[in-house]
């Protein structure tokens, strides 16, 4: 057993009696054993199938504090610090061929070296998917000039996915603060006018079906002058609502057949994320984009380490977001 696998096992034991970030990372005791469920059944795991998307988390600092942010980003949360070009380059050098590189946060456009990181990614031939709220950090003159230059050089290989928690301004602002919807729309118009490739990330309300949500987001996109097909999941991704302190069923090996799903389709089969913790000597790799606070899902200091062993699905979000919710952060 390697050092990182030993750390993950110990973290699993500790979770039986601890809560990680009491609401959003509430972990019921039944998820504490990485191999066996509370009923004694074999817990499902996901093996590595090859890199589709490498995520770079530029840090948890954000210009706003959303009520239900998946990783609780805010103007004061710096538990994940800004990535630098020096942090990122070793991971890019590990990659064979070209893949999708995703950049998330926090708000990536607050990262001081974000334009250089984007250049390093695309100059190697990778496609880039950057997640942003399209608000004031992106609209600073230095960032605007840099984005226009990158768009002119790399064209459709650069996609900015803008987060809109609802197509309804009141609901969006209740999540992100008064005026947030209008400010995001201003950023979207600016991107569209300059020919930057844009996608949207929304949330499907619990009382709203997929087709209704897509039609409403499509109407909004059209009003902003965006060339976006709401039926295309690459243009509009709708994430399942995450319920704080949710207690979903555990996923066993038998669930794949029962649900008609494959482990190969789960995010951690082909995606990983690079983070750097505050005070850490170097960047490390997590199993996915959501579980950055749980040490059981911090898998190593290189992509080779972080893809050596299957990921055990012993977290409620593995069930509610990925397996049952069908969520994936990549395009």
PLM segments and residue spans:
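Conserved alpha-helical substructure of the radical SAM core
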Residues: 23-105, 109-120, 124-127
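A generic secondary-structure signal marking the coil-to-beta-strand transition
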Residues: 50-54, 67, 158-160, 234-235, ...
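Canonical radical SAM enzyme core domain
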Residues: 76-90, 108-152, 160, 164-186, ...
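Radical SAM enzyme core and accessory elements
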Residues: 1-44, 289-331
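Short, acidic Gly/Pro/Ser/Thr-rich loop/turn segments
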Residues: 63-65, 169, 281, 295
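Accessory C-terminal segments flanking Radical SAM cores
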Residues: 240-331
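Conserved C-terminal portion of the radical SAM core fold
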Residues: 98-102, 154-164, 179-248
């Amino acid at each position: 057993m390697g050092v990182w696998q030993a750390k993950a096992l110990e973290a699993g034991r500790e979770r039986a009696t601890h809560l990680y970030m009491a609401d959003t990372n509430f972990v019921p005791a039944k998820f504490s054993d990485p191999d066996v469920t509370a009923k004694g059944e074999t817990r499902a795991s996901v093996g590595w199938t090859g890199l589709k998307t490498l995520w770079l988390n530029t840090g948890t600092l954000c210009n706003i504090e959303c009520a239900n942010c998946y990783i609780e980003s805010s103007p004061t949360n710096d538990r994940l610090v800004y990535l630098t070009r020096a942090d990122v380059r070793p991971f890019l050098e590990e990659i064979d061929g070209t893949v999708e590189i995703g950049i998330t946060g926090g708000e990536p456009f607050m990262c001081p070296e974000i334009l250089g990181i984007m250049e390093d990614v695309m100059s190697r031939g990778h496609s880039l998917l950057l997640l942003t709220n399209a608000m004031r950090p992106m609209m600073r003159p230095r960032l605007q000039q840099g984005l226009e230059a990158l768009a002119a050089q790399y064209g459709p290989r650069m996609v900015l996915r803008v987060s809109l928690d609802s197509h309804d301004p009141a609901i969006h602002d209740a999540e992100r603060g008064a005026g947030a919807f209008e400010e995001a729309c201003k950023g979207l118009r600016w991107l569209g006018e300059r020919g930057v490739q844009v996608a949207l990330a929304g949330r499907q309300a619990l009382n709203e079906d997929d087709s209704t949500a897509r039609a409403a987001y499509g109407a909004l996109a059209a009003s902003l002058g965006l060339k976006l097909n709401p039926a295309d999941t690459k243009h509009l991704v709708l994430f399942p609502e995450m319920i704080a302190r949710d207690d979903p069923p555990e996923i066993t090996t038998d669930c794949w057949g029962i649900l008609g799903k494959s482990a190969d389709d789960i995010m951690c089969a082909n995606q990983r994320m690079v983070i750097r913790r505050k005070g850490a000597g170097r960047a490390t790799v997590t199993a996915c984009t959501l579980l950055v606070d749980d040490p059981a899902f911090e898998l190593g200091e290189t992509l080779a380490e972080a893809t050596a062993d299957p990921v055990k699905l012993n977290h409620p979000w593995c069930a509610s977001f990925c397996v049952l919710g069908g969520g994936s952060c990549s395009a």
